[in-house]
């Protein structure tokens, strides 16, 4: 049985750890609120951009723009969003497992795909397993600006435009609620034209200057960059929620451990006192 000193030391160290996890929970909660706000503020812009894209594409069904034209997939591009820091439960590992499973299922050679990674945990995970990384971005801010991710988003788009890849998919954790995040795969390029007919009626009376193709050549890359940025905002909200939940669970577990250790301490203390009383009584009896 552990001594009173050992048990007391464990209680003190666990209390200190609980203070840390509780503080981290509060910090993550604050970051989550900001991330939710950023995502909500970005949604109206994306909706308007989506309206413009579907309207122009709907009015130009025969568009030859490469971003709207599916082609035979010989090489896939994967943009993977993970965290830079740990202590977020299975946030990154679930996304990476999904990616690895898809690679093993769909590809027989590393020449058939390119991987772009956001987040140090993803870089470390893939490098340790021998996967080649096309490009990476680490130290992504907790509240990323568009400028902070634009370069890597443009690189992913350029790979598609220059036909180094034939499709681009994003692997990330979608924020559902504080208690739920969902590993998700999103097709980014080529863009879907399923909804393009929705804008055709509302834009049929408009004239496009200089012409629809010229407008698409400018607006489509901007739209895809924005789509990637919006996905990163979503993933960041999911990360903060996952870390907040993990720290709350750690704090709750610390509370339970402190209670158990306190019970052990009291029992050990009681046994020690009983032993001391027994020794005193025994000594008194021997003196009589």
Swiss-Prot record:
Disulfide bonds: none annotated. It is a peripheral membrane protein. One of its GO terms (biological process) is proton motive force-driven plasma membrane ATP synthesis. It is found in: Cell membrane. GO terms for cellular component: plasma membrane; proton-transporting ATP synthase complex. InterPro entries: ATP_synth_F1_ATPase_gsu, ATP_synth_F1_gsu. Its main location: membrane. GO terms for molecular function: ATP binding; proton-transporting ATP synthase activity, rotational mechanism. Keywords: ATP synthesis, Cell membrane, CF(1), Hydrogen ion transport, Ion transport, Membrane, Transport. Belongs to the ATPase gamma chain family. F-type ATPases have 2 components, CF(1) - the catalytic core - and CF(0) - the membrane proton channel. CF(1) has five subunits: alpha(3), beta(3), gamma(1), delta(1), epsilon(1). CF(0) has three main subunits: a, b and c. Produces ATP from ADP in the presence of a proton gradient across the membrane. The gamma chain is believed to be important in regulating ATPase activity and the flow of protons through the CF(0) complex. This is ATP synthase gamma chain. It comes from Staphylococcus haemolyticus (strain JCSC1435). The lineage of its organism: Bacteria, Bacillati, Bacillota, Bacilli, Bacillales.
């Amino acid at each position: 049985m552990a001594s009173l000193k050992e048990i007391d030391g464990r209680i003190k160290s666990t209390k200190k750890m609980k203070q840390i996890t509780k503080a981290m929970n509060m910090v993550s909660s604050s970051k989550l609120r900001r991330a939710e706000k950023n995502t909500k503020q970005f949604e109206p812009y994306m909706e308007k951009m989506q309206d413009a894209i579907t309207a122009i594409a709907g009015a130009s069904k025969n568009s030859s723009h490469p971003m709207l034209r599916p082609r035979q997939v010989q090489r896939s591009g994967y943009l993977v969003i993970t965290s830079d820091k740990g202590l977020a439960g299975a946030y990154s590992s679930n996304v990476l497992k999904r990616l690895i499973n898809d690679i093993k299922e769909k590809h027989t050679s590393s020449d058939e795909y390119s991987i772009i990674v956001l987040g140090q945990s993803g870089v470390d995970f893939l490098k340790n397993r021998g996967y080649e990384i096309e490009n990476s971005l680490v130290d992504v801010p907790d509240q990323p600006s568009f400028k902070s991710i634009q370069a890597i988003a443009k690189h992913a788009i350029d790979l598609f435009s220059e036909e180094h890849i034939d499709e681009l998919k994003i692997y990330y954790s979608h924020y559902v609620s504080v208690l739920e995040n969902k590993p998700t795969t999103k097709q980014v390029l080529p863009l879907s034209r399923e909804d393009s007919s929705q804008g055709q009626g509302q834009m049929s009376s408009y004239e496009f200057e200089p012409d629809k193709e010229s407008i698409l050549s400018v607006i489509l890359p901007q739209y895809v960059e924005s789509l990637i940025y919006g996905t990163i905002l979503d993933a960041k909200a999911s990360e903060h929620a996952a870390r907040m939940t993990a720290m709350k669970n750690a704090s709750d577990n610390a509370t339970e451990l402190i209670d158990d250790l306190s019970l052990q301490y009291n029992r050990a203390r009681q046994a020690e006192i009983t032993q001391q009383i027994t020794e005193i009584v025994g000594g008194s009896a021997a003196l009589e």
